Amino acid sequence: FLYLAYTAPHWPHQAHEEDIDKYRGKYSMGWDQLRQSRYERQIKLGLFEEKHRLSPRDSKVPAWTSLKPEKQKEMDLRMAVYAAMIDRVDRNIGKLISVLKKQDLFDSTLILFMSDNGACAEGETLGRGNIFDVKKRNLEINNNYGAAWANASSTPFRLYKHYTHEGGSATPFIMHWPKGIKSQRKWYRHSAQVLDVVPTLLEVCGVAYPETYQGHELYPLRGISLTPSFSAKPLTRTKPMFSEHENNAFMIDGSWKLVGKGVATPKGPDIKKWELYNLKDDRTELKNLAQTENQRLKEMADSWHAWSLEDKVYPKPSGKKKKRKN
């Protein structure tokens, strides 16, 4: 078993100059054109259906054409550095695969590749930290590309890491195992979550999940095995998927998604902040059905609250910092 966790492309955004040079100028068209072209390619590849519309540009992000040429040059470089980081990750994963092939282990190795969250919009809207001076850039500890490029990275979704809307929580997940997964050459559209990884690996290895470990009782195993997907069969999920992150939350039950910003307050969930979407028809969360599907929203909100108590989301701290004693 090998767990390979890259920090890239998390900030600070830093990369080798020879990698950056490959991408200089490639983003000079700006985020507006990039979002549109990526969306059109996603539709062409069948990743999304045309009924799932491209979300509007984030309201805090300016139009690319409104920037002065010098600022456009800076922003092109910020994205080039980010792209260079991913380029280096990609090549090093390629090295690992090459070794597996040389050792005749590639076909029998199950590879799981995923991201932990959506694009990061932390910091200034147009990025932060020095980007032109190479020495200073590589000494920065928090420089990044900003919400403007993160908005493009999340295409076609809206919002980012920290939020539980699709732009923050829906990420790529690739499983590769020539000896165990039948190639279907088509998109598999059943939802999975990170909690499904352990049940999947346990089943593949033929290992039962223990009730105790070193005399301590273990929490029940959450999630389901994804092995039905190996032959393109539907997943047998009988319970909704729940999440809470930094007071934001979601619940997905079939095609219905309950989601909200700042829902999980210290006093309990704020039902007024819940939004409701039918992901089957509206994957980009543009049509909030909270008013027209009020009863469904209430039932899902009650289910989320019950889960939050069971999984100890509550009680939450008040948020008031205690004064330190000297």
Task: Map each language-model feature to its residues.
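Short acidic-aromatic active-site loops that bind/stabilize oxyanions
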Residues: 71-87, 164
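Short, solvent-exposed turn/loop segments enriched in Gly/Ser/Thr/Pro and often Arg
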Residues: 2-12, 54-62, 112-121, 127, ...
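Active-site regions of oxyanion-processing enzymes, predominantly non-cytosolic
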Residues: 1-58, 85, 89, 99-114, ...
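Short glycine/proline-rich turn/loop motifs
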Residues: 61-78, 176-182, 280-285
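Histidine-centered active-site microenvironments of extracellular/periplasmic hydrolases
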Residues: 13-15, 98-177, 326
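Non-transmembrane alpha-helical segments in soluble domains
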Residues: 20-24, 39-43, 83-86, 90, ...
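C-terminal cap/loop subdomain of S1 sulfatases and analogous C-terminal strand-loop tails that border
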Residues: 139-168, 180-190, 194-279, 310-314, ...
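Beta-sheet entry/capping signal
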Residues: 1-3, 107-112, 173, 239-241, ...
